[in-house]
């Protein structure tokens, strides 16, 4: 989809704000249901990031798999938890909570200071996948595989890391209760 510059910029800012608000909602909201809905907002914004780059299949797959299946599964799992046990000792801070918040804050500060100083225009993106696709020797599923392993490798791996962290958090919560 070829959008004019101002509309494309507005869309990116809007989706970025959705990312930030959803991420803050996941971390800061005390109700697990609202936290899961905020995760759904983050995943919807992730799928909408693919539409300006003409990757409608990846956007639809992201929406169906992550929002339609994973987030609904998380919401059902949270609904089956006993809420009274979850909130009983919520106000107490431990040493582990302090260390975790210190590590997260240091990672956040390092990212905030590193990202603006990075020369993103110096990164050489691969053109091999475009050469393969232009030959019309492969079918659509092979084209999707090539795009996922070249052009969209970073977002694909980032969402897998986010899901791994969520799974580890769910397992640790389940072991506590």
From Swiss-Prot:
Pfam family of the protein (one): Oxidored_q3
Predominant subcellular localization, coarse grouping: plastid
Catalytic reactions on record: a plastoquinone + NADH + (n+1) H(+)(in) = a plastoquinol + NAD(+) + n H(+)(out); a plastoquinone + NADPH + (n+1) H(+)(in) = a plastoquinol + NADP(+) + n H(+)(out)
Membrane-related topology note: Multi-pass membrane protein
Keyword rRNA-binding appears in the UniProt entry: no
UniProt cross-references to InterPro entries, sorted A to Z: NAD(P)H-Q_Oxidoreduct_6 (IPR050290), NADH_UbQ/plastoQ_OxRdtase_su6 (IPR001457), Nuo/plastoQ_OxRdtase_6_NuoJ (IPR042106)
Record's keyword annotation contains Magnesium: no
GO cellular component, one term: chloroplast thylakoid membrane
Transmembrane region(s): 10-30, 32-52, 61-81, 92-112, 152-172
A single MF term (Gene Ontology): quinone binding
EC numbers, comma separated: 7.1.1.-
Compartment(s) where it occurs, according to its Swiss-Prot or TrEMBL record: Plastid, Chloroplast thylakoid membrane
Keywords of the record: Chloroplast, Membrane, NAD, NADP, Plastid, Plastoquinone, Quinone, Thylakoid, Translocase, Transmembrane, Transmembrane helix, Transport
Enzyme class: translocase
Protein's job: NDH shuttles electrons from NAD(P)H:plastoquinone, via FMN and iron-sulfur (Fe-S) centers, to quinones in the photosynthetic chain and possibly in a chloroplast respiratory chain. The immediate electron acceptor for the enzyme in this species is believed to be plastoquinone. Couples the redox reaction to proton translocation, and thus conserves the redox energy in a proton gradient.
Family: Belongs to the complex I subunit 6 family.
Subunit: NDH is composed of at least 16 different subunits, 5 of which are encoded in the nucleus.
Protein name: NAD(P)H-quinone oxidoreductase subunit 6, chloroplastic
Source organism per UniProt: Ranunculus macranthus (Large buttercup)
């Amino acid at each position: 989809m070829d959008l004019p510059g101002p509309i494309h910029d507005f869309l990116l800012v809007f989706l970025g704000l959705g990312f930030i608000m959803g991420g803050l909602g996941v971390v800061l909201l005390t109700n697990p249901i609202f936290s899961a809905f905020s995760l759904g907002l983050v995943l919807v914004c992730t799928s909408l990031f693919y539409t300006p780059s003409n990757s409608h299949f990846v956007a639809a797959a992201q929406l169906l798999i992550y929002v339609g299946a994973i987030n609904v599964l998380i919401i059902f799992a949270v609904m089956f938890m006993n809420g009274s046990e979850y909130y009983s000792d919520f106000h107490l801070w431990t040493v582990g909570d302090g260390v975790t918040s210190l590590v997260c804050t240091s990672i956040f500060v390092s990212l905030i200071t590193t990202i603006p100083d990075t020369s993103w225009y110096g990164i050489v993106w691969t053109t091999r996948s475009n050469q393969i696709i232009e030959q019309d020797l492969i079918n659509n599923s092979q084209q999707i595989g090539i795009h996922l392993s070249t052009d969209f490798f970073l977002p694909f791996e980032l969402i897998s890391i986010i899901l791994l962290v969520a799974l580890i958090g769910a397992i640790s919560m389940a072991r506590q209760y």
